[in-house]
């Protein structure tokens, strides 16, 4: 299982059976990984649901071009190779600019894909999020794109600012697309 998609349809679950073959998931768009592919893979027997079933999973802690190869051999053993995509990556190593391979986080749950999501959320909150920011209230941001899309004008902006003030939003954002209109 891997997650892919497009704008507005991010993180669509794609289940692909792992036979005696290789499955290659990669991003080499010269940009960060995005909705098209995420550096993540999950393995189950094919019967896991959102609430039940064993799921083994791994996430590459890397936001750039990546490659994950899932391979099953004749004996049924599964191997995962994950890291920076070798397609177009060139890294000159020096004493001043060493390279540290990104971490690949592995996990297991017997509680299906939902259990996997909950475990990953807790792990990110407990270990990745800087603890000095973990419990700090975040500002409420009001973005003009969602209520008005391309229909941005002075009247709508004033109405939006008034609504934002009523709900306690601190910043009001007018997106670059809106500015061009």
Model-assigned labels for residue ranges:
Residues 1-124:
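N-terminal accessory beta-strand-rich subdomains and adjacent acidic, glycine-rich linkers
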Residues 17, 39, 98, 102, ...:
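Proline-rich intrinsically disordered, low-complexity coils
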Residues 82, 128, 143-146:
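Residues at structural and domain junctions
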Residues 121-135:
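Long, charged amphipathic helices and adjacent flexible linkers at domain junctions
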Residues 133-181:
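Aromatic-lined carbohydrate-binding/catalytic grooves of carbohydrate-active enzymes
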């Amino acid at each position: 299982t891997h997650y892919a998609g497009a704008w507005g349809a991010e993180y669509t679950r794609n289940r692909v059976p792992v036979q005696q073959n290789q499955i290659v998931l990669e991003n080499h768009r010269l940009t960060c990984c995005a909705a098209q592919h995420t550096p993540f893979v999950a393995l189950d027997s094919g019967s896991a649901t959102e609430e039940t079933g064993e799921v083994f999973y791994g996430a590459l802690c890397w936001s750039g071009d990546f490659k994950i190869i899932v391979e099953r051999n004749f004996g049924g053993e599964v191997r995962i190779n994950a890291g920076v995509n070798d397609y177009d990556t060139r890294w000159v190593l020096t004493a001043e600019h060493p390279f540290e391979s990104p971490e690949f986080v592995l996990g297991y749950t017997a509680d299906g894909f939902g259990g996997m999501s909950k475990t990953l959320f807790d792990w990110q909150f407990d270990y990745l999020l800087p603890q000095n920011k973990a419990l700090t209230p975040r500002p409420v941001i009001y973005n003009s794109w969602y209520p008005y899309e391309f229909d941005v004008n002075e009247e709508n902006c004033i109405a939006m600012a008034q609504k934002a003030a009523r709900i306690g939003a601190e910043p009001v954002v007018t997106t670059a697309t809106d500015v061009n209109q």
